[in-house]
From Swiss-Prot:
Region annotation 2-C-methyl-D-erythritol 4-phosphate cytidylyltransferase: where it falls in the sequence: 1-246
EC number: 2.7.7.60, 4.6.1.12
Region (2-C-methyl-D-erythritol 2,4-cyclodiphosphate synthase): 247-406
UniProt similarity note: In the N-terminal section; belongs to the IspD/TarI cytidylyltransferase family. IspD subfamily.
Gene Ontology MF: a single term: 2-C-methyl-D-erythritol 4-phosphate cytidylyltransferase activity
Heme keyword on record: no
Tagged with keyword Chaperone: no
Site (Transition state stabilizer) location in chain: 24, 33, 279, 378
Organism from which the protein derives: Rhizobium rhizogenes (strain K84 / ATCC BAA-868)
Function: Bifunctional enzyme that catalyzes the formation of 4-diphosphocytidyl-2-C-methyl-D-erythritol from CTP and 2-C-methyl-D-erythritol 4-phosphate (MEP) (IspD), and catalyzes the conversion of 4-diphosphocytidyl-2-C-methyl-D-erythritol 2-phosphate (CDP-ME2P) to 2-C-methyl-D-erythritol 2,4-cyclodiphosphate (ME-CPP) with a corresponding release of cytidine 5-monophosphate (CMP) (IspF).
Protein name: Bifunctional enzyme IspD/IspF
Cofactors required: a divalent metal cation
Binding-site list for a divalent metal cation: 253, 255, 287
Amino acid sequence: MTQMHSTQPMSIGIVIVAAGRGERAGSPEEGPKQYRAIGGRPVIAHTLEKFVTWPQTTKIVIVIHRDDEKLLRSAQETIVDSSGVEIAFGGTTRQQSVLAGVRQLEKTGVSHVMIHDAVRPFFDHDLLDRVAAALAAGAPAVLPAMPVTDTLKRADTDALVTETVPRAGLYAAQTPQSFRLADILAAHEKAAADNKTDFTDDAAIAEWAGLPVTLVAGSADNVKLTIKRDIAMADEKLSAGLLPDVRTGNGYDVHQLEPGDGVTLCGVFIPHDQTLKGHSDADVALHALTDALLATCGAGDIGDHFPPSDPQWRGAPSRIFIEHAARIVRDHGGTIMNADVSLIAEAPKVGPHREAMRAKLSEFLGISLERCSVKATTNEQIGFVGRREGIAAIATATVVYRGGRP
């Protein structure tokens, strides 16, 4: 690796290239690979966080597709502070996207730029320090790279090997590829003006423009996530070190009894000489469990989602509420592991209907019967429950969420 020396002061800006669509990484429905989750967060969040927390970062520009701004903002929410990050919109090729990012970064006045693939999340600050040291020593272009270790073959159009390529002196290029900003901007502008669009990385443009490119040691971990299996393996790697994110939510509800023909508990109608008074069907058990589920992801309570002042919920079956809460949990990345309901009532007797209630909970929540529990007790004729003026319910939900981050 070449060593160069200079005392030129510098400031480093970052261009993260994230405008690609990632056709090789799965179906379009799965979204661009830079926004797929690994270890509970989008790929780009891991990449961005490394630069945000690197002490030498002066400014960051992320180049994205115009359709992805909402995805990026969502990813940024998982990072402690990325408020100073700017967005540029990319073109139809990586080369066009890099040019857009470097043009925007130039306005900030930084002297040097690191250009990095968003889908290389496993670099570290040591790598950035090595690149920065080479820039500080006066190198106009710096390329982190790893010596090629695999045997290389050249083949003809019929897939027949024509030769074994000597690997001595061959390196696999990585990012961030880093430059004096004015030099690489001029090189990109000239390439665009000359309609030269066949470059596979920024170092190749620098070479074409006559800039000497200095190699520094890359990192074996600094792999590019290209295909679907890469993303799955990255997720396995990061998830292995995460604590399980197990959350417990509690809910409580009570409804008054009045003369009637029966009560609905856990979605099961039980004939009785009283009924529960409420805006909906007054299923006190499902109301308590709805609150318990919402509590596991900080999503408020049943009144926030279904206000009793709204006439559309008058007489509504409470399965609407519990299924809505279960969807919210799943949208937040949660898996419902257990639902437990304790009913407190003098009458009617719950025991004969317990299994039907458990079956309803299993149906509403989409979980197995063994994960659903219904219990009942009296209040020993004490208080409003003991006087048969109402029924109370206490519910607990256990949910496991992806990620394990506090």
